[in-house]
From Swiss-Prot:
The keyword rRNA processing does not apply. The keyword Cell membrane does not apply. Signal peptide: none annotated. This is Cobyric acid synthase. It comes from the Bacteria. InterPro entries: Class_I_gatase-like, CobQ/CobB/MinD/ParA_Nub-bd_dom, CobQ_GATase1, CobQ_synth, GATase_3, P-loop_NTPase. One of its GO terms (molecular function) is catalytic activity.
Amino acid sequence: MTARTLMIQGTGSDVGKSLIVAGLSRAFARRGLRVRPFKPQNMSNNAAVTAEGGEIGRAQALQARAACVAPSVHMNPVLLKPQSETGSQVVVQGRRVGTAKAREYQAWKPRLLSAVLDSFDHLRAEADLVLVEGAGSASEVNLRAGDIANMGFARASGTPVVLLGDIDRGGVIASLVGTKAVLDPDDAAMIRGFLVNRFRGDPSLFADGMALIAARTGWAALGLIPHFPEAARLPAEDVLGLKGSVRPSARPGARVIAVPVLPRIANFDDLDPLRAEPGVSVVLVEPGRPLPAEADLVLLPGSKTTIADLIAFRAEGWDIDLAAHVRRGGRVLGLCGGYQMLGRRIEDPHGIEGEVRAVDGLGLLDVVTVMTPDKRLAAVTGASLPDETPFCGYEMHLGETRGPDAARPLLRFADGRPDGAVSADGRVCGTYVHGLFADDRQRALWLERLGTSSAGEAYEAGIDAVLDRLAEHLERHVACDALLALAAG
């Protein structure tokens, strides 16, 4: 039996496509359906490791969790990881296949479509329902030739589309009606209905708006979805998810963790468990602002291009702020790329990251990193040292780091391998492990080191509870039975 398929496309970026697919995945999974999420092409530096040892966009990993299945490389067969303003690393079915500038990538698309359809068929063979998420805006008709992310995929796979608009940003009628106006008629015919997301207030006040959109487009009105504030508790994939929380007011008595927002910040969902703690204020420091003097911990996050981000870090004067923080007795933690920056030197003999082949590090750890072509992708478990507190997380990095401070590892993996480094005074640390703070035991340990305590809430269980409430929210406000009826079989 062939799975039914349905695609959620958007009138623009950040209209809530990922969230709606996650919520619908949980809603239909709770009905007993075997659900698989799918996004043909994603662009993000926030990635997750799959059981196959590949990588996919973090949003698809969350959607897989919502569907109550393990994430697979087939859920996001093409992942673009930006390395510059014009170029990206290209990951196909979980494996890095090269880098391409935007114009070059257009020539790649025809051959990538076969990989996309192969992964799609793989998921259809094991599911009752495949929920597909589009990318960006459905109305970008200038990119239609060779498209594999929106209507190009919908047409190639015969997947019907529901168009999602965001009323919170204004102009939702124009964005929905206007999308139909600019689409090729054959593309527009793939759209069977529409949803309006993030409504605030009395829904009866927009009843005539829903009717107007339906009349102008001929599409079925499938739901007016009220704003869901708890969405902020779910891991964000886009850097847009970091906006609006820069330099928040510190809660009285809270420990301050300062995080510089690097140009190519990656895997920043490492911060989410810390942001959920009432005893912590995570201060996201944007370019143009100094690292706050009141910080208890400066956390250097992951980076897609470590050398370029280190150069940008210095250009902001943050290296001076960080040195002053250390002299005041403050703590420093580097995660993955941030760990590499803390060393004496970073070398890139193969030019993996670009033209700069070597750069001096921040010199806070006596280690040297050499970039290597092979990427380490794996789920890991082990214990921190010397306290032997267990942890689970994942590795996703290029490069090997060695030096005297690495003889004092921060962690030890279950297979006995050491990871990370600790300075002689114990106040500067680095590790390659992502997801450390999502482990309740490790988060409690780090907060204790900062002189506070965890609220004791199970972070992962909290994510599932929010997904359940999101599913209930959508069941109330979306015509879910009608969505199933629209899905192609």
